């Protein structure tokens, strides 16, 4: 399947903030963000299947954002150390201004107790790439060593529930 990645023209932080003020929980906020992303692209690409996805991280009722620098990544890893956190995912497909598929799931991730030396070495290896991930770790790289246990779909941890998505695309005869 050929595809094109198009950045959505939305203010994620503002949408997240507004939805939280409205009293919505992580699942609803993730869905609102995924829908807003897909909708912003779908408006410019009618008759096209547009996939929007979002992932939130919640630990002990605290919502995390992507770290903005290595120092904030360090602080985030210190807060996640030894804790179980949730990755809350939502993926939405829009075609012709209509949501035709939605999928949500939550993954529980337990992090090892991390000492400052391990965090420092990890950040030195990964560099600013950790700022692309809400958890400041990349499971597909050295970040796997930080985790004690994962309960959930591997692809969803990476940000896209690939197997359910492929199932939908096959059911719609888009994949053969």
Predicted regions and their residues:
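GST superfamily/GST-like fold recognition
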Residues: 1, 73, 83, 106-176
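Structural motif
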Residues: 48-49, 85-86, 90-92, 129, ...
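Active-site-adjacent loop/tail segments of enzyme domains
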Residues: 55-85, 111-113
């Amino acid at each position: 399947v050929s595809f094109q990645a198009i950045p959505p023209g939305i203010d994620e932080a503002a949408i997240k903030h507004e939805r939280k003020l409205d009293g919505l929980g992580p699942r609803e906020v993730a869905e609102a963000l995924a829908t807003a992303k897909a909708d912003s692209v779908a408006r410019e690409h009618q008759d096209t299947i547009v996939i929007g996805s979002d992932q939130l991280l919640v630990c002990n009722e605290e919502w995390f954002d992507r770290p903005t620098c290595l120092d904030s990544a360090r602080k985030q890893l210190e807060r996640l150390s030894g804790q179980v956190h949730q990755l809350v995912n939502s993926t939405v497909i829009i075609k012709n201004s209509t949501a035709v598929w939605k999928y949500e799931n939550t993954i529980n991730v337990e992090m090892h107790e991390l000492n400052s030396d391990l965090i420092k070495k990890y950040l030195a290896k990964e560099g600013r790439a950790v700022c692309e991930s809400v958890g400041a770790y990349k499971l597909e790289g050295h970040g796997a060593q930080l985790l004690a246990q994962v309960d959930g779909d591997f692809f969803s941890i990476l940000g896209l529930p690939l197997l359910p998505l492929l199932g939908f695309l096959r059911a719609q005869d888009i994949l053969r």
